[in-house]
């Protein structure tokens, strides 16, 4: 199987699994919104803001470190060095995961009562502490399988973890001991801990099986310096991640406090916070499943190109990734602008959720493009620049939340989110464009997609109004309308020349590799020698 096809196949597996996981997760958030209401979701979101800081400390950058070092060693066909890196990563995860568990368990009363100002969060934090060691091991296994392009294994583990979490949560919420907001938070924490533990056990078993299979035919090569290289990648990422996670935790703690200082009641402040973070943002992040799957695979792919010094392959892959991301994000942004109220009503039976979704629709192109740019920077060994930008962005967000929320309320926070993404993206994209010479075409990447999206939404809205006897903006009809708009959007892009023939041929060639062989343009009257410069150029063109 060709390299590009393998990359696309792994990305498709990741995309489908990520789509399934986000769909299940969004359905579960809908269930929680109806079960424990917005203020209950807000309380658990506060718990998760502190837990995310503990998760950052438990992982300590080991996922990316494992992916980079293992991918580089497999690219050099040095299997013993890859296994040495894996063993070092497991020891690293055991240390930081155990330390994070002890710290979170012991500091839970202080964090819950002093930081979150709510004693109901303490039992949930203590229970979540036991999920940190298995989570750290799962990060190592995930990084290893990502480096080996075994996307389906990470997909299976993700689906298993999500299904276990939801099954435990639903079962516990039905018991009388877990009624009320504190009981609901405790049930969700227990479900997350059980899911992480079960998933880690399966990950380790599969990892052992994988290592035994490789040992049969692996040559013995030098593996010195692997642990030092792993620490060189992981520790700086960990240190910067600590700072950013701490700033994000402070930001999330300040949001309900700022809303209360603006005049809102405590329950109303938790409800507004829960609506934005527990309802609206999952909807915005749901389409990102398609891109995040390929973004995860960009890291090892670009890492191998970077080690070999193949600048042309890096430029082509980055250019195509940016193009597809912008096209997709503009379509999703238009969907949210047009159907925000309907989505809020159908999913959550909440008009306020629809209004927040409309206000944050402009966040979609910024967030999606920033996500793919960050992945490319990590693959090109520019992760420190990316983390530096994230820290600056998080610090500015904390200051803005502290200063603006008490005066302007929740509207200020929505604008802070948009401004934060714009600032972060401008720094990250400028860094990427300095490292990789990508040709930017504003008409093809910005103007035409926006016009085609507006045209597609206008046409489908006009047609649906003529067929209002058969269609409405409720239930499945709403999603049919959204699907028709998206299909028409890409059709208009093709008609306007935004999507070119070469793009269509490239996509079809991924599914039908024989198609390129039958094309007479790909054949040469006189085949060049296999070692010649012309042959290498031809092979490189066919691969991309």
What are these regions (language model features)?
Residues 6-67, 101, 105, 131-132, ...:
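Signature of the first transmembrane helix
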Residues 10-25, 192-203, 207, 224-300:
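Transmembrane helical elements of multi-pass membrane transporters/channels
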Residues 21, 29, 60-67, 127-146, ...:
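Short runs within selected transmembrane alpha-helices of multi-pass transporters and secretion channels
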Residues 60-75, 284-309, 318, 322:
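Helix-loop junctions and terminal segments of transmembrane helices
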Residues 93, 97-246:
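Hydrophobic transmembrane helix module of multi-pass membrane transport proteins
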Residues 109-128, 335-367, 371:
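Interfacial segments at transmembrane-helix termini and the short loops linking adjacent helices
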Residues 171-177, 194-220, 252, 374, ...:
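C-terminal transmembrane helix end/exit motif
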Residues 462-544:
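Membrane-proximal transmembrane or re-entrant/amphipathic helices at the cytosolic face
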């Amino acid at each position: 199987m060709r390299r590009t096809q393998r990359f696309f196949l792994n990305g498709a597996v990741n995309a489908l699994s990520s789509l399934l996981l986000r769909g299940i997760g969004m359905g579960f958030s809908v269930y929680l919104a109806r079960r424990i209401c917005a203020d209950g979701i807000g309380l658990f979101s506060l718990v998760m803001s502190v837990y995310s800081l503990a998760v950052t400390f438990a992982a300590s950058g080991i996922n990316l470190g494992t992916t980079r070092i293992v991918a580089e060693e497999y690219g050099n066909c040095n299997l013993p060095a890859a296994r040495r890196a894996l063993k070092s990563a497991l020891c690293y995860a055991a240390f930081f995961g155990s330390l994070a568990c002890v710290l979170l368990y012991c500091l839970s009363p202080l964090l819950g009562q002093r930081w979150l100002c709510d004693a109901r969060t303490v039992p949930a934090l203590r229970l979540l502490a036991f999920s940190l060691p298995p989570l750290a091991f799962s990060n190592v296994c995930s990084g290893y399988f990502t480096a080996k392009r075994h996307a389906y294994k990470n997909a299976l583990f993700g689906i298993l973890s999500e299904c276990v979490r939801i099954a435990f949560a639903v079962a516990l919420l039905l018991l009388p001991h877990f009624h009320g907001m504190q009981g609901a938070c405790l049930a969700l924490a227990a479900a997350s801990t059980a899911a992480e533990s079960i998933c880690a056990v399966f990950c380790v078993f599969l990892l052992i099986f994988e290592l035994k299979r490789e040992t049969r035919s692996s040559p013995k090569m030098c593996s010195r310096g692997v642990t030092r290289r792993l620490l060189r990648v992981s520790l700086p990422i960990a240190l910067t991640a600590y700072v950013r996670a701490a700033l994000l935790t402070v930001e999330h703690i300040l949001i309900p406090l700022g809303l209360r200082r603006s005049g809102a009641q405590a329950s109303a402040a938790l409800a507004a916070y829960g609506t934005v973070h527990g309802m609206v943002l999952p909807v915005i992040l749901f389409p990102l499943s398609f891109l995040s799957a390929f973004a995860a695979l960009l890291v090892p792919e670009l890492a191998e190109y970077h080690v070999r010094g193949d600048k042309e392959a890096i430029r082509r892959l980055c250019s195509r990734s940016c193009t597809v991301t912008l096209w997709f994000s503009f379509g999703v942004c238009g969907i949210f602008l047009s159907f925000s109220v309907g989505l809020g009503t159908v999913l959550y039976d909440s008009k306020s959720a629809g209004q927040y979704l409309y206000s944050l629709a402009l966040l979609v192109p910024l967030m999606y493009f920033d996500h793919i740019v960050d992945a490319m920077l990590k693959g090109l060994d520019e992760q420190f620049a990316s983390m530096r930008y994230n820290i600056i962005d998080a610090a500015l967000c904390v200051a803005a939340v502290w200063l603006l929320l008490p005066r302007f309320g929740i509207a200020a926070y929505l604008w802070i989110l948009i401004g934060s993404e714009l600032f972060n993206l401008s720094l990250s994209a400028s860094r990427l464009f300095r490292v990789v010479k990508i040709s930017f075409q504003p008409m093809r990447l910005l103007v035409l997609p926006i016009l085609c999206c507006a045209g597609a939404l206008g046409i489908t809205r006009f047609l649906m109004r003529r067929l209002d006897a058969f269609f409405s903006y409720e239930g499945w009809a709403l999603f049919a309308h959204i699907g028709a708009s998206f299909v028409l959007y890409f059709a208009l892009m093709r008609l306007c020349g935004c999507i070119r023939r070469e793009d269509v041929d490239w996509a079809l060639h991924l599914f039908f590799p024989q198609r390129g062989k039958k094309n007479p343009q790909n054949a040469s009257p006189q085949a060049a020698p296999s070692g010649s410069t012309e042959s290498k150029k031809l092979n490189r063109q066919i691969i991309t």
